[in-house]
Each structure stands twice: as C-alpha cells, then as structure tokens.
C-alpha cells in the first residue's frame, strides 16, 4: 500500500511518518521494488480523486490521507447511471466464416452486390462482404474494422452498490463471462436465444437467416402510449428484423416501448424497445420528442446482437438450403465504460456470450483516512502491528450510496483509461531495449579484454620459448580461455526481438488522428493476455534493478577472472597440458 495525496496538516505526525518510512527503506526493505513516489500513471487519478472530495466533502479533504492499492487486479466498479444506458456509443465489429469457400459461382451472387462498390466477387469473403454492404450501408459510422479486445481486463473487481440495470443471457452453450449477484442488480433484463429462422428474398435467391433473440417482458410495464409516443425509430439496416428504411416520403414510425420498474418514485425512468433493443431515458414531465436523437447502437443492442448469424441460400423453393456463410457480430464500449460480469470487466462482448453483466466505470481501489491518524509502516520484524488503521472507502467520502446510483445522480467521472496500458507497454519495451544495449556493450568489452589477454599470452610464450613455454617456465598448469560469447549474443538477440515485438504492438495500438472515436480497439491485441502483461509492467522496475545488479556482479567476476589470467593464477575452468613426452 502506498500513501499519497494531501498530507496531514499536523507537522509532528508527518515527520514521524517519514522517519518510520526512511527507517524501513534503509533496514527492512532492501529489495523494495517501488520507489517512494507513486507511479506517474496514478498521479492523474490521485488529483482527480482529491478534486472530487473537495467538491463533495470540503471539510474532509483539508486533512486526510489518500491510500491507493498498487495491486494490478484491485479495482472498484462504480455503476453507470441511467443516462449512460441510453447515450453511450457502441462500435460494431464484423467477422465472417465459411464452411464451403466456393459454394456458388460469382456471377450468381452478383445480386448481393452494392452497385456503388468496385469490389469484384471473385472469392467467398468478398461475396459475403457484398451481401453485408446491402444490409449495412446505413451503419458505416458505427462499423470498426479493427480487431476487438477480448478477455477480462480485471478479475477481482468489486461493486459496492447495486446497479440500476443488468442484462442476463443464460445460454446452454457459449462463452461464460461471469454472473453478478442478484443483490447487485436493481432490475435485470433477461435475453432468450432464438429458436426459429426467418426468410428474406434478395435478387433471385431465397435466404434463411437466424432469427433475433427476445426479451422477457414479464416484469415490464406497458406505458408506451404515455411516454414513448413520438419516439422515432433510428434509420438503420443492421438485419432484416432491424431494418428501418427512411426517406423524405416515408419518415420513420414512432416506436413503442415498455417501462423498466424503478425502486424509487422519481421523474427519471428507463424504457426499453424490446423489438430493436434500445434503451430510452425519459423524463415523465417532458415528451420524448424533446430529447436528442439517440444512437441506434447501445449497450443493450450490443448484448442482444453479440452472436453468430447463420445465412443459408436456396436456389428454388423446392431445393435444400445450403449454408452460405456465418456472420459474427461483436460490439465494444466507448472509452471509460466497461461491462462487469461477475468479478471480471470487459471492453467487448464476444459472440455467443453467457452470463449476467452491467455497465460500470472503473477506478483503482482508493481509500482515505483521517489526517490525525498515525499511519504505521509495516516492518519486517517478528512482531506484527496489532492496531488496524480505519480506512474508509472512497465512495463513502464522495457521498455515494445505492439509492443515489439507482436514481442516476451517482458519479460517472472516475474511470481508468486503457491508455494507461499503452504507455506502460511503451515504457517496458524501452526498458528491455536499454537492457539489451547495455549487455551488448558489456559483452563487447569482455571480448576486447579477452583478445588483449590472449595477445599478451602469446607474447609471453615467445619470450619463454627457450625454456619450453610459459607454463613450463613457471612450472604451473596451463590455462586456456573458453569463449562463450555466442550464448550471450543469442540472449541479447532474444531481448531485442522481444522489445521490438512489444514496440510494434504498442505502435499498432496508436489510433490514427482521423479515427479518434475508435482508438480503444487498438490498445491491446486480441491474443495478448492482459493480466500477465499488466503484471510484467507492474514489476518492470524490479526486473530492471535485478538485471542491473546482475550485470554489475558479472562485470566484477569477469574483471577478477581476467586479472587471474594475466597473473597466471590457477582456475578450475582451465585444463592442464600433459607434462610427459608422448611415447614413441
């Protein structure tokens, strides 16, 4: 635990703390991996936390300790407020797979082509892409071609208060993400898998497409005539059962939606469009037409549509349908928002996911203590500190509770940006590069020193040739140099390759300036395990210190070894020459 932030105003308490800390650093923690100051990437979090405390509790912030855990998995989740469910943007990722790469000739699939496209349907992937362009021509602002990030970002996340809304999909087969406790969900929307297919005709072909999922409406209230009248459908064409063509002659029809029950009787309410999986944040004192236009892709849309969509084609009504391709829909949240499923957080929902999730903001585990408290530094002694400092969770200091979050008045400003992972990855790859360069210089010095020693040895052998050579002249065992520089250079090459790989990955994460809204999907590659990388980044300074100490010890050993060679001292690494003359 590292203590940072605003120090207590009591000077004697502060001096006593620093004295204990200095004593522990000098005598009890010789291998302390982290320096006294906090890592630079946590400075912004500490400053933001202090600002929030100053705004919510001024009497407390003037004399308190802020305590932040440096554990890579210790995070606290703050539930997203009601408006986040209706206004948070989503990025869409598409992937296709084929059972038969060349099932139909290209000329028969020309009906699926978007006429504005210049791509010729010469392979199945382009044929499927042409078909998708027909459906997705109105969704181009929301489609992201970069690979999404899967896998949990954190695995020990706690949520201290109940979230206003959760989404649950319990499939018999799927990718399990985790299940939130019912006590952490004020209301849960249950999704059910489709059991039928729908038919769609395009050109001369009859398509059979997997039907949409459904939402359990048993606990929803039908008040659409009062609150959703005038709410227009978004103009999208994601799927036949989501298509909503718009034109000047035929404006979109108003949608109908159901009320999500709220434990509090207030004017802010959530309504759900169960047909198009949209959440509307309504105020019952104002008509919905006065609210701004909402995005057609929302977190509920992502949860409902994240799956595999099979497409079969049929030449005639009497022929057997043949599988054309499978469309995999995957969605990712915007910066700062995360899906919390059980105790794990995700940026993206994989296709065919299963579990119970909600929207949250992430913050490191931050606590605070009264500035008059004496904070003991744990020493490595047989006795243990019996007195426990009363650390208060940050949410209590900010005045957050389950009711305030459910009402939508909770805080949504504290979040851990994924940019942290990118900067730490850059720093770690730079450290590895510096280590490899240092080892290269040291090995070059060792090779140069060995060449000098061998050259001196040859000179001494020439000077003592009349006496039978240096070894016979000294009447000692002869020593020879065993060159193992090749192994060192191989290890240096591995370090450089690893550093180059990390640098390439970090550069690939950087978002181009023309795609600022999609930079989060570049943060980490798909196959990189996030938790091990984060642990490596956390202990990078410790590894660098140990390697530096190893290099110093190695230099000292090589120097001593070279001196022994120069003064012809014995060494177990050298081999004696035979002293007897060979027999005739």
UniProtKB/Swiss-Prot annotation:
Changing residue 81 to L: In allele HERV-H19. A motif (CX6CC) lies at residues 471-479. A motif (CKS-17) lies at residues 454-470. Keywords: Cell membrane, Cleavage on pair of basic residues, Disulfide bond, ERV, Glycoprotein, Membrane, Signal, Transmembrane, Transmembrane helix, Transposable element, Viral envelope protein, Virion. Low expression in skin and testis. No expression in several cell lines. It holds the Pfam family TLV_coat. It is found in: Virion. Specific enzymatic cleavages in vivo yield the mature SU and TM proteins. The chain crosses the membrane at residues 524-544. A motif (CXXC) lies at residues 64-67. InterPro entries: TLV/ENV_coat_polyprotein. Residues 388-408 are annotated as: Fusion peptide. Residues 36-523 are extracellular. Glycans are attached at residues 47, 199, 222, 265, 283, 352, 370, 483. Residues 1-35 form the signal peptide. It comes from the Eukaryota. Disulfide bonds join 471-478. GO terms for cellular component: plasma membrane. Residues 545-584 are cytoplasmic. The surface (SU) and transmembrane (TM) proteins form a heterodimer. SU and TM are attached by noncovalent interactions or by a labile interchain disulfide bond. Ortholog in Pan troglodytes. Retroviral envelope proteins mediate receptor recognition and membrane fusion during early infection. Endogenous envelope proteins may have kept, lost or modified their original function during evolution. This endogenous envelope protein has lost its original fusogenic properties but has immunosuppressive properties in vivo. Belongs to the gamma type-C retroviral envelope protein family. HERV class-I H env subfamily. This is HERV-H_2q24.3 provirus ancestral Env polyprotein. It comes from Homo sapiens.
């Amino acid at each position: 635990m590292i203590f940072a932030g605003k120090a207590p105003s009591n000077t004697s308490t502060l001096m006593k703390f620093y004295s204990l800390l200095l004593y522990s650093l000098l005598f009890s923690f010789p291998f302390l991996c982290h320096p006294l100051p906090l890592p630079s990437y946590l400075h912004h979090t500490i400053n933001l936390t202090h600002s929030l405390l100053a705004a919510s509790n001024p009497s407390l912030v003037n004399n308190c300790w802020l305590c932040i855990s440096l554990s890579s998995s210790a995070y606290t989740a703050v539930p997203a407020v009601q408006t986040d469910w209706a206004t948070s943007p989503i990025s869409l990722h598409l992937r296709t797979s084929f059972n038969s790469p060349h099932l139909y000739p290209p000329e028969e699939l020309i009906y699926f082509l978007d006429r504005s496209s210049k791509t010729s349907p010469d392979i199945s992937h382009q044929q499927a892409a042409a078909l998708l362009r027909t459906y997705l021509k109105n969704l181009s602002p929301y489609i992201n071609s970069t690979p999404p990030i899967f896998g949990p970002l954190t695995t020990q996340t706690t949520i201290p208060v109940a979230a206003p809304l959760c989404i649950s999909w319990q499939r018999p087969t799927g990718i399990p993400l985790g299940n939130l406790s019912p006590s952490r969900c004020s209301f849960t929307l249950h999704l059910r898998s489709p059991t039928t297919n729908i038919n769609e005709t395009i050109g001369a072909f009859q398509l059979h497409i997997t039907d949409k999922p459904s939402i359990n409406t048993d606990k929803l209230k039908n008040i659409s005539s009062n609150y959703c009248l005038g709410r227009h459908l978004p103009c999208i064409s994601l799927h036949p059962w989501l298509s909503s063509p718009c034109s000047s002659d035929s404006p979109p029809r108003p949608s109908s939606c159901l009320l999500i029950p709220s434990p509090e009787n207030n004017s802010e309410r959530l309504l759900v469009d169960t047909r198009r999986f949209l959440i509307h944040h309504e105020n019952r004192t104002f008509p919905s037409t006065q609210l701004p236009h909402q995005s057609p892709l929302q977190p509920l849309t992502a949860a409902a549509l994240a799956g595999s969509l099979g497409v079969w084609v049929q030449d005639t009504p009497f022929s057997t349908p043949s599988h054309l391709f499978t469309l995999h829909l995957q969605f990712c949240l915007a910066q700062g928002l995360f899906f919390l499923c059980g105790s794990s957080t995700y940026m993206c929902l994989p296709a065919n996911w299963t579990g119970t999730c909600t929207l949250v903001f992430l913050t490191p585990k931050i606590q605070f203590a009264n500035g008059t408290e004496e904070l003991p530094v744990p020493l490595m002694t047989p006795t243990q500190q019996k007195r426990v400092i009363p650390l208060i969770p940050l949410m209590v200091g900010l005045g957050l509770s389950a009711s305030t979050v459910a009402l939508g008045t909770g805080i949504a400003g504290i979040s851990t940006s994924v940019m942290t992972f990118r900067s730490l990855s850059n720093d770690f790859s730079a450290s590895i590069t510096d280590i490899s360069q240092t080892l290269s210089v040291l090995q070059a010095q060792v090779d140069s020193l060995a060449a000098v020693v061998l050259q001196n040895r040859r000179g001494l052998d020439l000077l003592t040739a009349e006496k039978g050579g240096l070894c016979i002249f000294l009447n000692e065992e002869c020593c020879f140099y065993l060159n193992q520089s090749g192994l060192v250079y191989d290890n240096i090459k591995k370090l450089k390759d690893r550093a180059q790989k990390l640098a390439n990955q970090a550069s690939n994460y950087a978002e181009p300036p023309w795609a600022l809204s999609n930079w989060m999907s570049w943060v980490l590659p798909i196959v990189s395990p996030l938790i091990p990388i984060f642990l490596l980044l956390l202990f990078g300074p410790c590894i660098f210190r140990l390697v530096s100490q190893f290099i110093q010890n190695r230099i000292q050993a090589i120097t001593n070894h070279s001196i022994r060679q120069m003064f012809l001292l014995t060494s177990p690494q050298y081999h004696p020459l035979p002293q007897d003359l060979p027999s005739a």
